[in-house]
Amino acid sequence: MSRVGKSPIALQGAEVKLADGVITVKGPLGTITQAVNPLVKVANNDGTLNLAPADESREANALSGTMRAIIANAVHGVTKGFERKLTLVGVGYRAQAQGDKLNLSLGFSHPVVHQMPEGVKAETPTQTEIVIKGIDKQKVGQVAAEVRGYRPPEPYKGKGVRYADEVVILKETKKK
C-alpha cells in the first residue's frame, strides 16, 4: 500500500462531505470540490479522513496516495490558505495589483496585464514584491509560474521575476 495513502488526514476545523464520487471540503476561507476516483475508498472517522485502495492493483495503490495528497491540500487550503511570493529584480521592474488584475512593468515596450483566475488574489506589499494567495494550491502555483514566465531570471545578471526562495546561479561572463 502507498505510504502517503496510509496516513490519515486531520480535518483541522474543515467540514467534509462525500456524495456520489465527489468530496466537498468546506472551511473558513472557502469551499473546494474534488472528484474521487472509484479505485479509492474514503472513510470519515470523526475528525480524520482515511483513504484506502479499493482493490490490490498498482493503479489503485498509486491513486490512493495521490488522492490523499490532493484532499490534504484542499483541507489545508480552506483552513489556512496557500501563498507564493515573487520578487522582481531589475531596474524599472514594477508590479501593481488592481482588483483582479496584476499590472507588470518588465522592461517591454508595453505593460503586461495578467488576469487573475477566480479564487486567486494578488497583493503587492512593495513595487518589487508580489504575493499570490488562494485556497487552491494548484491554481496559486500555476498563476505564480505564469507571472514568472513573463520574464524568468536571466543567468548573467539575474534580472527578471523569481520566486522569493529561488536561488539564481549566475554564470561568469566571457573572458578575452
UniProtKB/Swiss-Prot annotation:
NCBIfam families per the UniProt record, alphabetical: L6_bact (TIGR03654)
Record flagged with keyword Ion transport: no
An MF annotation (GO) of this entry: structural constituent of ribosome
Organism ancestry: Bacteria, Pseudomonadati, Pseudomonadota, Betaproteobacteria, Burkholderiales
Protein name: Large ribosomal subunit protein uL6
Family: Belongs to the universal ribosomal protein uL6 family.
Top-level taxon of the source organism: Bacteria
Keywords linked to the UniProt accession: Ribonucleoprotein, Ribosomal protein, RNA-binding, rRNA-binding
Any Gene Ontology biological process: cytoplasmic translation
